[in-house]
Amino acid sequence: DVKFTSPITDHEASDNCGVEILGAEEKIFWKDRKGANINSIRTKKSIKDCDVIIVKFGEKFKQWNAAFDAGYAAALNKSMIVIHNDDHQHALKEVDGSAAAVASDQKQAFRILKYILEGSLK
């Protein structure tokens, strides 16, 4: 069985989950803290429960969360597939060093999973 989980990709929902659930905050710091704490519960559970983690470093945002998740997964000795383009190779060399595989795109990561699960290169 394969089950995929991911961070909440609705940026507004991710940012506002804390105040929506726990109540408003006057200061942005505490608003962000509430949301981050709730999101971290979900992320930690997903990483702890997984057999293989895929961490994608994209172009749109700074990738602090992806790097943090990769470090957490490495600390838990999870098998990790990292996805990033060549522009990030130098900056991510330590992350790449702890990964089982480094892919340049999602198609390559999918082929790795297919091979792991089915033994197929097709």
Model-derived segments and their meaning:
Residues 1-122:
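Conserved catalytic or regulatory cores that recognize and/or transform ribose-phosphate-containing ligands
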